[in-house]
């Protein structure tokens, strides 16, 4: 018994491409006779043939007016049948301009997807320029303002400042593989407190080499040259000029996909080195106790449960080796660390992008007098596009910092931030940011709480010229005496881009 929605072809073998309306009788009111399909009945007339021809024409007309039928179960949809033979050129045009119909899990033709409205790129965003197979986006930032506490210590007077910065982003435009590099450099001059002048240079690069469709090689590296925070707990209160430090490193590894399961293995090396600090009396404070090299490896297993969402589990181990076997107090500060975390990545373009994870970390120190450091591990970087005009960013970071404070093995630092960007107009963007951080010193009752709140406006005059104004307030509250401070920073700036 044929299905209700299957084409029912007419019995005329000379024109089999014609069909009648599903469920309709072949020739209403006429019964088959012994004459077959000769067209003549028993009285030698052509009435039977004429009736069949009329029924066929009615069926063709009705079939052409049938709406498309989409099955939600196992029934198959009636496919349109061309009533006239197409030319070869017409068939080629139809094959080129018509996408094949998608099938659902039952084999039925799935409904057409809803065509979303095209979203135009930022009309005030930088376009960059092409150099061979690379796209370059340079920028220059000139700003100035006032900082009420550049030293981030109690009792430090305020000062006006100027800042000059430059950036260059390089992105490959290859059909396979990928390479990105970001260079950022700046220098701040304090007019009334020159000892707090500070450089800041950051270089980051990452590359992906597509070995096969399933296997990729991953390489990344970074370099940072900057001045230490004047309020660093590792520095004494009589530091006249914050020390400079270098932090550099990189990782290399590979990623392989087994269908939906992705395995990523990385190994890396990180290096941190400090210069001497200058004290108020002109003497130098040796900070080589803080210099160390870290070796580590990590393994991640991710499984794509649905397009754009990949839960994962990740674990890693590392070893920190200091340049000096013992510090100035005769203490060995080498340590081993391990962590494990679970999380998920989001790649829902235009809706939610980023990663969030939670777990636990631990550091075991070679010095038996030091307590092991253990704590929760929270890391995230999420961007949520709430509306076409509003974007929400959430960030969390957990790290273990080295310490040279007597009796302290290390400091567990946790930082959280939320930023809201809203476009009042396409050329006027408002930004509000809230942040909180805590430093817990293992082996000491000291706990530092850090807060930040800021707000600003960006006026996009053209794609190449942006003006900005912002205000930021920072303050620290600690249970240790003499370290609390508050800082208010006002900034006006001009940004030139390409």
What is each residue range found by the language model?
Residues 1-498:
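Gram-negative and organellar
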């Amino acid at each position: 018994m044929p299905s209700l929605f299957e084409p029912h072809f007419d019995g005329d073998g000379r024109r089999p491409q014609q069909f009648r309306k599903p469920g309709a009788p072949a020739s209403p009111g006429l019964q088959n006779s012994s004459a077959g399909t000769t067209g003549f009945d028993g009285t030698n007339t052509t009435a039977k043939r004429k009736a069949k021809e009329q029924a066929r024409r009615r069926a063709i007309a009705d079939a052409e007016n049938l709406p498309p039928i989409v099955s939600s179960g196992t029934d198959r949809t009636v496919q349109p049948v061309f009533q006239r033979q197409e030319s070869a050129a017409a068939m080629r045009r139809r094959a080129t301009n018509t996408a094949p119909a998608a099938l659902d899990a039952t084999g039925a033709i799935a409904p057409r997807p809803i065509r979303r409205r095209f979203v135009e790129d930022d009309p005030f965003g930088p376009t960059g320029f092409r150099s061979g197979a690379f796209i370059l986006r340079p920028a220059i930032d000139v700003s100035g303002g006032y900082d009420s506490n550049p030293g981030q210590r109690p009792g430090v007077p305020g000062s006006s400042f100027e800042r000059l910065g430059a950036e260059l982003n390089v992105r490959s435009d290859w059909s396979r593989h990928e390479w990105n590099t970001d260079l950022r450099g700046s220098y701040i001059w304090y007019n009334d407190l020159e000892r707090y002048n500070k450089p800041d240079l950051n270089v980051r690069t990452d590359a992906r080499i597509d070995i096969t469709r399933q296997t990729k090689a991953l390489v990344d590296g970074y370099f940072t040259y900057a001045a230490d925070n004047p309020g660093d707990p590792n520095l004494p209160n009589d530091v006249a000029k914050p020390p400079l430090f270098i932090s550099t490193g990189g990782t290399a590894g590979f990623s392989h996909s087994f269908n939906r399961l992705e395995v990523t293995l990385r190994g890396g090396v990180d290096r941190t080195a400090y210069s001497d600090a200058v004290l108020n009396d002109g003497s130098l404070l040796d900070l080589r106790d803080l210099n160390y090299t870290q070796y580590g490896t990590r393994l991640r297993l991710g499984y794509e449960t649905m397009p754009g969402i990949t839960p994962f589990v990740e674990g890693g181990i590392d070893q920190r080796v200091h340049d000096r076997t013992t510090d100035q107090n005769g203490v060995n500060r080498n340590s081993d660390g391990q962590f494990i975390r679970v999380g998920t990545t989001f790649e829902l373009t235009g809706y939610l992008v980023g990663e969030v994870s939670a777990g636990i970390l631990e550091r075991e120190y070679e010095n038996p007098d030091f307590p092991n450091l253990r704590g929760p591990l929270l890391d995230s970087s999420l961007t949520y596009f709430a509306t076409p005009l509003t974007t929400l960013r959430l960030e969390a970071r957990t790290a273990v910092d080295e310490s040279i404070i007597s009796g302290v093995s290390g400091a567990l630092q946790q930082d959280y931030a939320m930023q809201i960007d809203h476009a009042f107009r396409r050329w006027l963007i408002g930004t509000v940011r809230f942040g909180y951080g805590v430093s817990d010193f293992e082996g000491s009752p000291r706990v530092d709480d850090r807060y930040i709140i800021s707000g600003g406006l960006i006026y996009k005059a053209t794609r190449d010229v942006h003006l900005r104004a912002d205000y930021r307030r920072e303050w620290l509250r600690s249970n240790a005496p003499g370290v609390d401070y508050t800082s208010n920073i006002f900034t006006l700036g001009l940004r030139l881009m390409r």
